[in-house]
Amino acid sequence: MLPVAALSGPFAPVLSATSRGVXXXXXXXXXXXXXATPEPPVLDPKRPILSRESLSGQAARRPLVASVGLNVPASVRYSHTDIKVPDFSDYRRSEVLDKTKSSRESSDARKGFSYLVTAATAVGVTYAAKSIVTQFVSSMSASADVLAMSKIEIKLSDIPEGKNMAFKWRGKPLFVRHRTQKEIEQEAAVELSQLRDPQHDLDRVKKPEWMILIGVCTHLGCVPIANAGDFGGYYCPCHGSHYDASGRIRKGPAPLNLEVPTYEFTGDDMVIVG
């Protein structure tokens, strides 16, 4: 208004500047809108903000170690004086109760006692293990009825002189030969240097007139034929092994003599094989 009055010129004396305030609804709406706006929060810069980033920065990134030195900052140590240290004097030997005395003088006696206890324990454990193993092995052995069947009783009076009789014993052929006096003298006169498997005739018999053998050839397990071959004893038809009347190999591929089983004479007319 003042600039208009200044430029009016001749109308200036009759002009005057006035101002009037008029209330409007827009002012009330602006005041209400200003009052509804929340005030921004005020943060305390002195108080640390706890967040994942701030806490991760304070966490240790290397293994924790303890350092001791002159330039290391000191720490507070909390010690307790109310803890009782256990006393093991009741379990210790009298020779080592004195802290000011060396225990080397009694070390030999203490070691000897320890060795004695260890040895006694080892002997006891060994004996117990031996008993267990013996019982286990004996449980797998043949029973009494099986052992009884493993023996055969032969009546010698049924075998005439100069003849050979075959029996079945433990699934194998058993030869019982009643030798003549001529055969006994002939086999006893054989020199050991002539034999492939040197063995004297008297070492293979308990009674010279009775020759008991297992009738299995020592070459490949064939059954020899009695009273046959070049030496009048046994002959293997499979590969031509010749045995004499004492069952000793004399010719052919067989490497060993015929096997002599375990037997026992229970009388003049009875023998038990097995």
From Swiss-Prot:
Domain of life from the UniProt record: Eukaryota
Subcellular localization(s) per the UniProt record: Mitochondrion inner membrane
Cofactor: [2Fe-2S] cluster
GO molecular function: 2 iron, 2 sulfur cluster binding; metal ion binding; ubiquinol-cytochrome-c reductase activity
Matches recorded under InterPro entries: bc1_Rieske_TM_sf, Globular_prot_asu/bsu, Rieske_2Fe-2S, Rieske_2Fe-2S_sf, Rieske_Fe-S_prot, Rieske_Fe-S_prot_C, Rieske_TM, Ubiquinol_cyt_c_Rdtase_Fe-S-su
GO biological process: respiratory electron transport chain
Membrane topology summary: Single-pass membrane protein
Cofactor detail note: Binds 1 [2Fe-2S] cluster per subunit. Fe-S cluster delivery to the Rieske protein is mediated by components of the iron sulfur (Fe-S) cluster assembly machinery that reside in the mitochondrial matrix (including HSC20 and LYRM7).
Signal peptide: none
Transmembrane segments: 104-140
Similarity annotation: Belongs to the Rieske iron-sulfur protein family.
Protein name as catalogued: Cytochrome b-c1 complex subunit Rieske, mitochondrial
Organism: Lagothrix lagotricha
Organism classification: Eukaryota, Metazoa, Chordata, Craniata, Vertebrata
